[in-house]
């Protein structure tokens, strides 16, 4: 509906303005690791909505609504792939649940962000997504770089699982440009697709073998971004390698980020 369209396009534009230095708020992506229960997700969304409204002058808050999980080997791949979590793989049901949940969250007035993993599923949900991510395990993938170049929302690309920046920087450079590849249209036909390139891309520091949220790591990242002549906006993921997968460790990570920002670092524009 018009209300959802206004929310999504308005939030995308605000994120774009923020990425290009025209909005001085901090961009915050917050929410569960992945969605497994829509009812719990709506309960969470209602609580987050109050925070979203209270701090909207200083923070641009969107809800993390991840339906797909990249696996290092095997495991549950997320709500879209296996919505009943019983290895029945009712993907059609998963797509319907995911889309309905995104609509319900948007109707509350809360924008949503997600990770794009499967190259086909974005056709079913992207119109309700305000921001997207390419994860550490797929940052080097040509398919995902091409996908990012054609998505109509801002995209963050994570550093590699080992902590290296190269995959993310190369990915951003690739996503900035136009690509031609085979893909599915909205009518589910296979066709040659040509993308325009996505200039609303940025790096996400998620740590690796060691954290990379500290001041030295951030400065090293900024230097690398400048040398690559790409967007110098930095988002920091307080989880994953930066918290060594200990959720309570996210608090001192965020405190460090806040200290860096208050100390004058205006390249840190976002946190997860």
Residue map of PLM features:
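N- or domain-start disorder-to-order transition segments that initiate the globular core
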Residues: 1-19
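Acidic (Asp/Glu)-rich catalytic clusters
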Residues: 19-22, 49-56, 100-109, 193-195, ...
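Short, contiguous, helix-prone interaction/anchoring segments in small proteins
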Residues: 23-29
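Conserved, mostly hydrophobic/aromatic
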Residues: 31, 236
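Glycine-rich loop at the start of a catalytic domain that most often binds anionic cofactors/ligands
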Residues: 38-50, 73-80
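A short alpha/beta connector and helix-capping loop motif
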Residues: 41-50, 245-272
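Active-site-facing alpha/beta catalytic cores
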Residues: 58-213, 217-218, 240-241, 245, ...
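Glycoside hydrolase catalytic-domain groove-lining segments
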Residues: 218-222, 226
């Amino acid at each position: 509906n018009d209300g959802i369209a206004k929310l999504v396009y308005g939030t995308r534009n605000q994120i774009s303005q923020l990425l290009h230095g025209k909005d001085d708020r901090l961009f915050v992506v917050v929410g569960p690791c992945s969605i497994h229960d829509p009812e719990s997700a709506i309960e969470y969304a209602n609580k987050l909505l109050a925070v979203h409204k209270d701090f909207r002058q200083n923070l641009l808050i969107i809800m993390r609504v991840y339906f797909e999980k990249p696996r290092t080997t095997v495991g549950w791949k997320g709500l879209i792939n296996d919505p009943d979590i019983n290895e029945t793989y009712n993907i059609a049901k998963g797509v319907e649940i995911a889309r309905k949940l995104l609509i319900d969250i948007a109707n509350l007035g809360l924008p949503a962000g997600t990770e794009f993993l499967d190259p086909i599923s974005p056709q079913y949900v992207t119109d309700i997504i305000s921001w997207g991510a390419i994860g550490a395990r797929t940052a080097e993938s040509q398919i995902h770089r091409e996908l990012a170049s054609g998505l109509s929302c801002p995209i963050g690309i994570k550093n590699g699982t080992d902590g290296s920046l190269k995959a993310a920087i190369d990915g951003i450079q690739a996503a900035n440009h136009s690509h031609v590849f085979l893909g599915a249209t909205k009518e589910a036909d296979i066709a040659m697709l040509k993308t325009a390139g996505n200039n609303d891309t940025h790096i996400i520091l998620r740590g690796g073998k060691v954290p990379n949220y500290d001041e030295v790591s951030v400065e090293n990242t900024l230097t690398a971004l400048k040398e690559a002549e790409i967007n110098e906006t930095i988002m920091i993921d307080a989880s994953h390698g930066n918290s060594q997968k200990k959720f309570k460790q996210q608090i001192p990570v965020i405190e460090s980020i806040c200290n860096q920002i208050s100390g004058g670092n205006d390249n840190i524009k976002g946190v997860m």
